Amino acid sequence: MEPVPLQDFVRALDPASLPRVLRVCSGVYFEGSIYEISGNECCLSTGDLIKVTQVRLQKVVCENPKTSQTMELAPNFQGYFTPLNTPQSYETLEELVSATTQSSKQLPTCFMSTHRIVTEGRVVTEDQLLMLEAVVMHLGIRSARCVLGMEGQQVILHLPLSQKGPFWTWEPSAPRTLLQVLQDPALKDLVLTCPTLPWHSLILRPQYEIQAIMHMRRTIVKIPSTLEVDVEDVTASSRHVHFIKPLLLSEVLAWEGPFPLSMEILEVPEGRPIFLSPWVGSLQKGQRLCVYGLASPPWRVLASSKGRKVPRHFLVSGGYQGKLRRRPREFPTAYDLLGAFQPGRPLRVVATKDCEGEREENPEFTSLAVGDRLEVLGPGQAHGAQGSDVDVLVCQRLSDQAGEDEEEECKEEAESPERVLLPFHFPGSFVEEMSDSRRYSLADLTAQFSLPCEVKVVAKDTSHPTDPLTSFLGLRLEEKITEPFLVVSLDSEPGMCFEIPPRWLDLTVVKAKGQPDLPEGSLPIATVEELTDTFYYRLRKLPACEIQAPPPRPPKNQGLSKQRRHSSEGGVKSSQVLGLQQHARLPKPKAKTLPEFIKDGSSTYSKIPAHRKGHRPAKPQRQDLDDDEHDYEEILEQFQKTI
């Protein structure tokens, strides 16, 4: 087949003959775009092979042959078209008459001229229909007697047979739809007429979208038929050609098999690496991989080392076989205690630094000393100094005495425990009180305890000869991440497998020839991968890793005069806890531990709770208000009356 313009090939194409393989004979390139414009291919090189799978009509451009004006018609245009001429044209009237008399057609016949004709004082415009009735002698010249219809009247014209055209014969035919006209090769580029359009004559120029397959293209290529390129049909000689289709690992992940698969890397995504493992450097173009399928289990744990100035971060597979031992957790604020609290599981902590309570805000916001033992009961609310509710963590103070001589005092404290209210912003420092020496697997640990938690690896994973987790004094297991991974090995090193997350390392690959062998026994998979700092913080931004919102800022301290004015006006509200969640029930105290308040705010006295043995005393307060205090309040009352 000789090369033809792409537009001509598509118009003459029979859809039933698809697919067809084409070779580009003359390439085209649009400057400013490498691959496509508006989703359509615009760059084809000479020699490219195209496998056309579907042709779709996009629109039809309707052109006025007289003025060259254009308009667009939708493929579902409902108008009807009639051809104004036939594919055969005649240069003179004599040729037209000769062809008509020699054929089975008889006179009269209708025709039109593509040029204006001036004769006998009249002008016949182009595309105006004339009816040739007979050939006669007129003024000694052999002429064609024609009838011209004008404004309901018929005018007889005598045109010499030597009159030059070109001329087109016209035959009445049944109106056709837009698709019927486009599917008839005999009507290609003919002048048509349509009563629903404003122009008497028009030419239809369809535009198609070609859907094709090309080498090394992941998706179907869309090519406009108006692309100025010549093509050649090579279907007969190219039936054996296999078009290579690249894949992404994320697409391989969606497959159900069969595995293993042999793949070759075509492209590695740009950007900083996510793992610090040796195999990352081997992921280059041309490297062959063996994909064994979906990794199991699908969850991972994000862990960070402790005990070093610069922490290291790891992604630990759920299949990790090392043994872990719990370590006490550290909590810098009361808000962190709330995040670790779980109903039904006692959480006991020990204060590791002295901290003064904000007794001006609430008398029950007690101070803590090093060694104070607390049991977390749950969240609640308490009255603040300004009458607003303050979010607090309700705790119970535990005894730190264990002698036999003090058993009675311990029993008394057990019957009447001291309640401690810690605002969420309380800047204390706590460490978890625990005595758990069991050795857990990673799966058991995450199932029984909430994250984050502190652990120590006491036995390495035997399937990981260079397990790095055993070298740290402690690990902080931060979050559990559920993400599908693919088990992969290098074709050059099938003995060691690793897991790739297609979501974050989506390689472009292509299926390679051959079927890899499945190794005997279980696959040796690296269950610990060290992360780069950049990727670690990227993981921490995931919805599954979102850290709880920071605690509210502490309330601003009021001035002394403002506090006293507030006290004199309405009195200090009771610091009784307003609300506790159902899971944090408080023990009923035997005696009242809160000071009583008199209606008159001017004579309010706050009593300091009795200091218990082993507890750091709270900041001393004046219990007996002197006369100056009363004088001050009297002056204030007089001042208010004066105002």
UniProtKB/Swiss-Prot annotation:
Modification(s) after translation: Phosphorylation at Tyr-632 is induced by LPS. Phosphorylated by Src kinases (Lck or Fyn) following BCR engagement.
Any one biological process term the GO annotation gives: inflammatory response
GO CC annotations on file: cytoplasm; nucleus
CABIT 2: annotated segments: 239-514
Induction profile: By contact to a reconstituted basement membrane.
UniProt keyword annotations, A-Z: Cytoplasm, Immunity, Inflammatory response, Nucleus, Phosphoprotein
Residue ranges, annotated region (Disordered): 546-631
InterPro entries: CABIT_dom, THEMIS
Subcellular location as annotated: Nucleus; Cytoplasm
Basic residues bias locations: 609-619
In-chain residues carrying the UniProt-annotated modification Phosphotyrosine: 632
Region of interest (CABIT 1), ranges: 1-238
Phosphothreonine PTM positions: 593
Tissue expr: Expressed in different endometrial adenocarcinoma cell lines and various other cell lines apart from the prostate cell line LNCaP and the ovarian cancer cell line BG1.
Role played: May constitute a control point in macrophage inflammatory response, promoting LPS-induced TLR4-mediated TNF production. Determines the threshold for activation of B cells by low-affinity and low-avidity ligands via PLCG2 activation and its downstream pathways.
Subunit details: Interacts with VAV1. Interacts with LAT. Interacts constitutively with GRB2, LYN and PLCG2; these interactions increase the activation of PLCG2 and its downstream pathways following B cell receptor stimulation.
Similarity section: Belongs to the themis family.
Protein's name according to its UniProt entry: Protein THEMIS2
Organism: Homo sapiens
Gene: THEMIS2
